[in-house]
A protein has these predicted regions:
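Nucleotide/phosphate-binding catalytic cleft detector across ATP-hydrolyzing
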Residues: 1-154, 173-188, 200, 207-305
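Ser/Thr-glycine-rich phosphate-binding loops at phosphate-binding pockets of nucleotides
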Residues: 159-165
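PRPP/pyrophosphate-binding module of the type I phosphoribosyltransferase fold
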Residues: 166-171
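A contiguous pocket-lining binding segment that forms or flanks enzyme active sites
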Residues: 196
Length: 305
């Protein structure tokens, strides 16, 4: 079975699921947890507290265990959880890191032997037969890339958890010589807002409060706290655009497609900005995973032909 996983610093996304990139480890099975994975004699549950940012996600087993959760969720979505399954895995990396980390990322997931674990007390054995690695951002627009061919130059801007990744398309084809990554994602903004709200309003808030305010959801936060959150988010969006201009990414003369959860949060500010002449948005936060799946399906079809 082919399964696509987008390993974000803030969230893990598959074609049908997304969850925070957070783990809690337990020496015994936690009695109240409704989703438990047992691997190598340890018990793991998903946590709302995301892992610290890491450029290289292969340095320990954390993202492999998160991937086991993702695989189990997708297998459960497809039907009754099988006792054994052969897996082809489609994953991605930021364009700027793609050339450097692609082989290492592939080797991290492709195990020579079967992997045994239990998901919600159901034993499973999987064999990851192959791993396909693709550039983020480009994957998100892969299903509609034919519609972008008429643009001589177009920037893909993926505002994610920790980074903002930029890729230039020339007549619909990625220019891998022009890919940039800025450490200006949603996590950096949230950390700044949490500090600011604490200093100005003597109140402790979390990432979920910020997301709810920016998405227009109901909260019990005071009006002045909401105002601080909105103004801070607008400033962060402006800072991203200013930094892009320093990298010679001028969105007054080139159209842009904005991707990622951050783009959804900042959409109102980006559309109103005089620094952006023409913008479209891919609002599905699972878009990269959907793109990985589509590209891997095409690659597998060629291999099997």
């Amino acid at each position: 079975m082919l399964i696509a996983v987008d390993h974000g610093n803030h969230a893990i996304k598959t074609v049908h699921h997304n969850f925070v990139s957070g783990l809690a480890q337990h020496s015994v099975r936690p009695p109240m947890a409704d989703e438990v994975l047992e691997y190598k004699g340890e018990y793991w549950t998903l946590s709302g507290q995301r892992l610290p940012y890491r450029r290289d996600k292969t340095r320990d087993e954390s993202f492999f265990i998160l991937t086991l959760f993702a695989i189990a969720k997708e297998l459960s979505y497809a039907g009754p959880l099988p006792a054994a399954e052969k897996i082809e895995l489609a994953v991605g990396l930021p364009p700027e890191h793609y050339g450097i980390l692609k082989d290492k990322f592939r080797a991290y997931f492709k195990r020579s032997e079967s992997v045994q674990f239990s998901y919600n007390d159901k034993p499973m054995t999987i064999l990851i037969r192959d791993v396909f690695v693709y550039p983020q951002a480009f994957a998100a627009i892969a299903p509609q890339k034919s519609q972008l061919k008429h643009h001589l130059r177009l920037f893909l801007i993926d505002i994610g958890g920790y980074t903002t990744d930029v890729l230039l398309l020339r007549s619909g084809k990625p220019d891998m010589q022009f890919c940039r990554s800025l450490e200006t994602g949603v996590i950096t903004m949230n950390n700044d807002i949490i500090r600011r709200v604490g200093a100005l309003h003597d109140m402790q808030i979390e990432d979920e409060h910020i997301s709810a305010v920016l998405r227009g959801k109901e909260t019990i936060l005071p009006a002045d706290v909401k105002d601080t959150i909105r103004k801070s988010a607008e400033q962060h969006a402006k800072d991203i655009l200013d930094q892009l201009r320093e990298l010679k990414v001028d969105l007054r003369s080139n159209p842009a497609v904005f991707i990622g959860g951050g783009s959804v949060l900042f959409r109102d500010y980006l559309e109103r900005s005089p620094l952006v002449a023409s913008a479209s948005f891919v609002e599905n936060v699972n878009a990269n995973a959907i793109g990985y799946q589509a590209m891997a399906e095409g690659q597998l079809s060629l291999l099997r032909a």
